[in-house]
Every structure is written in C-alpha cells, then in structure tokens.
C-alpha cells in the first residue's frame, strides 16, 4: 500500500551550522531587500532599526529563514559593484547576526566574491543564487 502523502514522502534535511533543519514540512523564508530600488519594497529597510524591525516581524509571523538581498534583479535596475553589494549586506548581516543569532540566514547573490564574504564573515547558512553558480 502506498502512502497517501507522497508529495513530502522523502525525508530531506539541511545542516545549518550544526542545526539539523527538517524539510519534511514546508519552511517559510522571509525576504529582506536592502536595496534602494527593489520593485517590491525598495528603500524601506536600509537602517539597522528598519532591518531589525522587519526581521523580527517576519520571524514572529513564522519565517524560519531570512533571505537578505542587496542587488535588485528587477528589469532596468542599476548595476552596482560587488563592493557596494557587500556594503549593503554588511549592515543587515551585522544587525541580524547580533540580534537574532539562531535564525537561518540566506544571502541572495550571484557573485562569488559576495557569497564568500557572507560565508566567511557571517557564517550564513544558505546562498540563494539565481545563476546556480554560473554567473562568475
């Protein structure tokens, strides 16, 4: 007899800094855009206070992962340097790691230089790369 619940029938998990995340049920990822030109919420979350307020709200509403993006992927968005992307991310990552040390952090970037900084300096748990590592 086959199980009725076949969509999540396999057992998957992620090991994030030694914490095993069970993916047998869906997880909520809160999106934090720290760009001034995001098509969704551009410019709303650029200060430490704004970042922490939004992060706390998303966690309270059920997010178990916070995905931080500092480069807008909207059509026609400004092309920024890796250094500018890193600068934007550092403000958010400093604040989140300090005030929410146990939250799972994902960084949305397609640049290896930015991903390396995020992993080395902030021990981010996930790199969310729209290019699957093929951009550079």
Question: Residue locations for each model-derived region?
Answer:
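Active-site mouth loops of central-metabolism enzymes
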Residues: 34-53, 78-79, 105-106
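Conserved, mostly hydrophobic/aromatic
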Residues: 32, 58, 62, 108, ...
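N-terminal amphipathic alpha-helix/helix-capping segment at the start of soluble metabolic enzymes
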Residues: 1-33
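Glycine-enriched alpha-helix->loop->beta-strand junction motifs that scaffold or abut catalytic
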Residues: 116-126
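Glycine-rich, proline-tolerant flexible connector loops at the mouths of alpha/beta enzymes
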Residues: 38-40, 65-91
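Short, well-ordered coil/turn segments that N-cap beta-strands
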Residues: 24-28, 63-64, 101-103, 123-125
């Amino acid at each position: 007899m086959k199980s009725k619940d076949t969509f999540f029938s396999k057992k998957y998990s992620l090991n994030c800094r030694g914490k095993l995340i069970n993916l047998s049920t869906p997880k909520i990822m809160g999106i934090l855009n720290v760009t001034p030109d995001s098509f969704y919420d551009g410019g709303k979350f650029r200060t430490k206070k704004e970042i922490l307020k939004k992060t706390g709200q998303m966690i309270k509403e059920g997010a178990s992962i916070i995905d931080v993006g500092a480069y807008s992927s909207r059509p026609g968005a400004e092309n920024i340097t890796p250094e500018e992307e890193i600068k934007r991310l550092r403000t958010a990552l400093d604040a989140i790691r300090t005030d929410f040390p146990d939250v799972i952090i994902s960084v949305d970037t397609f640049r290896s230089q930015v991903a390396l900084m995020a992993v080395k300096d902030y021990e981010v748990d996930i790199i969310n790369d729209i290019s699957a590592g093929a951009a550079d």
